[in-house]
């Protein structure tokens, strides 16, 4: 497995919200996105997903 996308519920001063983390095991990177499709697009750009 080269990557995974995890959905987490976070809390801040604006309240509760969902965030999606792209965990890139191949390149040892972690990125946070507000919507899942942006995380998927980034995985495609990095060559992790076809």
Each predicted region: which residue ranges?
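A short, charged, amphipathic alpha-helix used as a generic interaction element across diverse proteins
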Residues: 24-50
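Short N-terminal "domain-start" leader segments
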Residues: 1-21, 31, 40-41
């Amino acid at each position: 497995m080269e990557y995974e996308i995890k959905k987490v519920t976070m809390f801040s001063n604006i309240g509760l919200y969902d965030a999606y983390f792209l965990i890139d095991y191949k390149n040892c990177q972690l990125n946070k996105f507000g919507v899942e499709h942006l995380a998927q697009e980034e995985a495609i750009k990095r060559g992790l997903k076809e």
